């Protein structure tokens, strides 16, 4: 009886988790909004609403803002015009909270998650071929003592360096050609680089 109850609870948890995943259409719109929001952090500089500005923070912020309702109040507070925007997403209340409930490990969830935990507990491995990446996917590097994420935008990557000054907001955009020919080979995304772990996709997105 006890084992049967545990199995039922696990099954229900899986059903709930699956129901919160975005379908193919929602995932496409999520990517479009995610990329657009990330681009604005590059164009305008990091939003005052974006706390903990680093590489993982960019992903957390863009995902959280993507899942919100993008009404006129949101557009104004984020410095967006109403032109050239993706279609709005229809989401359940649970789906809108996905970026507030990251798996932090040890059975805990919350709005904050580190780069390594974002990859380990909240993403799925896609491969090491950059041609497999879709807009919004993450390119993950592990340097041993530190991990780093870049966001694939379709033709280039953007990322936050993890530090900023009065004259440098920390945001960077790098073309694929530049990335593949960097002198510092630790950051080249190919399978000959032991520091390049691979391309990862948020696990609530449809593959």
Give the role of each language-model region.
Residues 17-112:
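N-terminal capping segments
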Residues 9-19:
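Hydrophobic h-region of N-terminal signal peptides that target proteins for export
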Residues 57-61, 149-152, 157-160, 173, ...:
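Active-site scaffold segments
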Residues 6, 11, 30, 51-54, ...:
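Residues at the start of alpha-helices and the adjacent loop-to-helix junctions
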Residues 160-163, 170-207:
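Low-complexity, Gly/Ser/Thr/Pro-rich intrinsically disordered linker/tail segments
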Residues 1-4:
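Positively charged n-region of N-terminal signal peptides that target proteins for export
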Residues 81-167:
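...with weaker cross-activation on analogous glycine-rich loops/strands in unrelated enzymes
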């Amino acid at each position: 009886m006890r084992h049967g109850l545990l199995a039922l609870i696990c099954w229900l948890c899986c059903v709930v988790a699956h129901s919160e995943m975005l379908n193919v259409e929602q995932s496409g719109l999520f990517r479009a909004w995610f990329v657009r929001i990330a681009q604005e952090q590059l164009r305008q500089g990091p939003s005052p609403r974006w706390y903990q500005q680093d590489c993982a923070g960019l992903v957390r912020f863009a995902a959280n803002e993507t899942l919100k309702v993008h009404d006129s109040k949101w557009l104004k507070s984020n410095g967006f015009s109403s032109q050239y925007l993706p279609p709005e997403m229809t989401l359940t209340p649970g789906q809108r909270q996905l970026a507030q409930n990251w798996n932090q490990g040890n059975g805990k969830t919350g709005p904050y998650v580190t780069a390594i935990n974002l990859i380990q507990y909240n993403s799925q491995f896609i491969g090491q071929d950059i041609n497999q990446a879709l807009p919004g996917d993450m390119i993950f590097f592990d340097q041993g003592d530190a991990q780093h994420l870049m966001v694939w935008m379709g033709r280039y990557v953007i990322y936050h360096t993890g530090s900023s000054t009065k004259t440098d907001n920390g945001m960077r955009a790098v073309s694929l050609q530049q990335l593949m020919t960097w002198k510092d080979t630790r950051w080249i995304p190919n399978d000959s680089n032991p520091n390049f772990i691979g391309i990862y996709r948020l696990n609530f997105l449809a593959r």
